[in-house]
Amino acid sequence: MAQQPVVAIVTGASRGAGRGIAVALGSHGCTVYVTGRSENEGDAEVPGTIHATAREVTEAGGQGIAVKCDHADDAQVKALVDRVIAEQGRIDILVNNACWQGNVMNA
């Protein structure tokens, strides 16, 4: 029986630690759902997108799947989890890296 790849969700994976963790998981053959809010360059003040990270995961040897998700919105998070369960049947790893970066003086 063939071993199934590990299924991971990495939140906040457009850049930084989330991106690095997602790519590292990909290098071990994982299926990685790369989540965040930045779909296109320019969506945030800093570079990086979920699609670019998903490509890097796939290039590293895994399967990268980009999913736009605002983790401050419970309905979007539920939809993400429902999708992963429907497509993969399980979640093996959750890396909860999503955060808001900004100037608190402007918040």
Can you describe what each PLM-predicted range is?
Residues 46-51, 78, 99-107:
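Conserved mid-core segment of classical short-chain dehydrogenase/reductases
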Residues 11, 35, 69, 91-99:
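Rossmann-fold scaffold of SDR-type NAD(P)-dependent oxidoreductases
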Residues 17, 50-53, 57:
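Generic hydrophobic, amphipathic alpha-helix propensity
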Residues 48-51, 67-82:
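The beta1-alpha1 cofactor-binding region of Rossmann-like NAD(H)/NADP(H)-dependent oxidoreductases
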Residues 35-47, 71:
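N-terminal Rossmann-fold cofactor-binding loop
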Residues 3, 60-65, 83-96, 102-103:
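A glycine-rich helix->loop->beta "capping" turn
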Residues 2-39:
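Canonical Rossmann dinucleotide-binding motif of NAD(H)/NADP(H)-dependent dehydrogenases/reductases
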Residues 18, 41-43, 104-105:
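Glycine/Thr-rich phosphate-binding loops of Rossmann-like dinucleotide-binding domains
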